[in-house]
Amino acid sequence: MALDGIRMPDGCYADGTWELSVHVTDLNRDVTLRVTGEVHIGGVMLKLVEKLDVKKDWSDHALWWEKKRTWLLKTHWTLDKYGIQADAKLQFTPQHKLLRLQLPNMKYVKVKVNFSDRVFKAVSDICKTFNIRHPEELSLLKKPRDPTKKKKKKLDDQSEDEALELEGPLITPGSGSIYSSPGLYSKTMTPTYDAHDGSPLSPTSAWFGDSALSEGNPGILAVSQPITSPEILAKMFKPQALLDKAKINQGWLDSSRSLMEQDVKENEALLLRFKYYSFFDLNPKYDAIRINQLYEQAKWAILLEEIECTEEEMMMFAALQYHINKLSIMTSENHLNNSDKEVDEVDAALSDLEITLEGGKTSTILGDITSIPELADYIKVFKPKKLTLKGYKQYWCTFKDTSISCYKSKEESSGTPAHQMNLRGCEVTPDVNISGQKFNIKLLIPVAEGMNEIWLRCDNEKQYAHWMAACRLASKGKTMADSSYNLEVQNILSFLKMQHLNPDPQLIPEQITTDITPECLVSPRYLKKYKNKQITARILEAHQNVAQMSLIEAKMRFIQAWQSLPEFGITHFIARFQGGKKEELIGIAYNRLIRMDASTGDAIKTWRFSNMKQWNVNWEIKMVTVEFADEVRLSFICTEVDCKVVHEFIGGYIFLSTRAKDQNESLDEEMFYKLTSGWV
C-alpha cells in the first residue's frame, strides 16, 4: 500500500495533500479534489474542469467561498494565502447571473449582471447597456416591505410584479459590442436622440449592436409608460410618515461590495434608482432614456407621496403627466411611419437646456462684471416667537452679497439697519399659493444654539422670483453676480406660471375629458378630498399652461418642478445624536447635512459640506463623526440602517461635486471607493 494513500487523523494524506470539496452549481454536482495548500486558485479551477470532463465554456465561472462570503478572484493566490483548509466548502459558479431589475418607471426587466463585481461597477455596466450616462448617480436597493400589510406569500408578490413586466425580456450581455456611453463629458459626442421627442436618431440596432437588448426593444426605456390601472397605484407602498421614508433607505446596497457578498440571490428583484440627487449635464440629445427614467422616478415619488407638494403643484404635475402621456402615444405612432426628423432651431436651443440645482448657464447679458447686483424693495418680515401675536412688519430691505439688511424706511437706508442677516448656510423653503396670492420665503438661519426662523413675504410673482433666487444662491455662499442667478429667476417664474388657473375654462373641449383618469394622475390624498369630475376639470385647466410644450420639454419641466419642491433631494435616516436621548432624523442632501425633528421634519440645525474638514466612522460602535470648521463636531449613531450607508452618501456627494464638464475621461472608480468604502 502506497504511503500517499494513507489518511492521517487531521484529514490530510501522508504526502501532504488533502481533499477539497467543490460544488458545481451548473451541474448540481459535488466534486472532491486532492490538493495542497500551495496550489493556487487557477490551478484548482484547472484541475476541477479536467475532472469534470464536460465540454462547456467555463470562462465566466469562478470559485465562491460561502462560509466567508467571498469570491476567490485572485487566481495567483494559493489556498494557504486565502486560509482555505479541508473543511471549506467551495462553489464553482458563473459570475454573471440573472437579476429582475425594477427600473425607476416601476417596470421590471431581466438583466444579466456580474455578481462578483462591486455594485458600483455592476451599476455602471447596467447603465452602459441601457445607454444611461452618469451611472454614478444611480444604485441598487432591496425592495422595501410595506409594514401595514401582513406577510404575503411569494407567489402573491410575484403576480403583482408580473403585472409590471416589460414586453420582451431585456438581457444585458456580459460582453460584446454594445453602445459605449462616453465618460463624464465629450465635446465630440454625436447626438443619439431627437431633442424634440427623445426618439432614437438611428435604429436601435445601431446603438445596441447585435446584443439581446435590441431584440427586447430597448427604445421602450425612453418612452413614458402611463399608469394603466388605478389598482396598480393603490397597491403600491406609500410612506405614511417621515420615519417610513427613512426606513426605505435601509435597503441601499453597499457599492464597495459585490451582490453575492450582500446575499443577493439569482433572479432576485432589486430596484435601480437615482440615489444621488445631483443630476449632471442632462442633455436631450444624448439622454432620452436617462431623462425619461428620471421623470418616472419623480412622477412616482409625487404619486406615492414620498415628497410633499401643494394642491396647485399637484394639479400642475398631473397636467404635465397627462400631456406627456398623450405625446408619448402620438410619438410612438409617428415613428412607425417616419423615423427621420429634423431638429428645428427651437429644439436645438432646448437640447442645450440643462437642469441642475446649481444652474450652470452663462448669462448672455454679462453687464458690468466688476459690480455685484443688488436688490432693494419693501418686503414684509416676520420673526415668529413663542407667546407673541405680532404679524408681518414692512421694512425697506436691501440684498447685497449674501446678506439682507432691513430698514424702517427707504429714507433711512443710508444709516444703520434695524436688522441684518447673513444667509450663507441657511435653509430656504418656499411657501406659495398662487390662487391666494401668497408668496412667502421661509429662512432658517444658523446660529450657535440652532436656527433662527425668519419669514419674508413678497407682493407679487416677479418680486418673489428675484428674492427667492437670491436667497437660494446666498445659502450656497453665492451672490447675484453668479451666472446661474438669471436662470434661477426664470426657472422660478416658469414654475409659477405652470400653476396658473385658466381664466376661461369654457375653452376646454368636452370630448377630451373622457381620456383622463384622475386616479392615475394625482396622489390618493386629493382623490379623497375632491370628486373625480372636479379633479379632471382642474387638470385640464392646468394643462392649458403646458399644452404647447414638446415631449422632452414637458419631461424636463416636470423634473425641474420636482427639484423646486422644498423636500427635494433630502435622504432621511433615523439617528440618535451624541448627548441626545430621543430618536431624530439626519437628512443628507447634495451640499449639506440637516438635523431634523422626527415628527415634523423641521430643520433643527444645518451643516454645509463646504465647511466640512473630515468625517469618519467608528465601525465598532457604528458611530459617524463629522468635523466642521470652527471646532464644530457632529456625532450620531444610525438606529435603523448600517452606518456604512450614511458614510457612502456623504462620500458619494463629495465625489459627485468633483465632476466638471471639461473632463473627458471615464469615472475614477478608485476615488469613489476611497471616499465611500471606509476601508480601501
Swiss-Prot record:
Domain PH span(s) in chain numbering: 380-476
Parts forming coiled coils: none
Signal peptide: none
InterPro entries (alphabetical): Band_41_domain, FERM_2, FERM_central, Kindlin/fermitin, Kindlin_2_N, PH-like_dom_sf, PH_domain, PH_Kindlin/fermitin
Record's bilayer topology term: Peripheral membrane protein
A Pfam family matched in the record: Kindlin_2_N
Annotated region (Disordered), positions in chain: 141-165
GO cellular component, one term: plasma membrane
Binding site for a 1,2-diacyl-sn-glycero-3-phospho-(1D-myo-inositol-3,4,5-trisphosphate): K383
Region ranges (Interaction with membranes containing phosphatidylinositol phosphate): 40-81
Keywords attached to this entry: Cell adhesion, Cell junction, Cell membrane, Cell projection, Cell shape, Cytoplasm, Cytoskeleton, Lipid-binding, Membrane, Nucleus, Phosphoprotein, Wnt signaling pathway
Effect of H40A: Abolishes lipid-binding via the N-terminus
GO biological process: adherens junction maintenance; cell adhesion; cell-matrix adhesion; focal adhesion assembly; integrin activation; integrin-mediated signaling pathway; limb development; negative regulation of fat cell differentiation
Record domain FERM: where: 189-661
Modified-residue entries (Phosphoserine), positions: S159, S181, S339, S351, S666
Effect of K383A: Reduces phosphatidylinositol phosphate binding. Reduces integrin activation
Induction (UniProt): By serum in lung fetal fibroblast cultured cells.
Annotated PANTHER family: FERMITIN 2-RELATED (PTHR16160), FERMITIN FAMILY HOMOLOG 2 (PTHR16160:SF11)
Identification of the protein by name: Fermitin family homolog 2
Organism: Homo sapiens (Human)
Gene it is expressed from: FERMT2
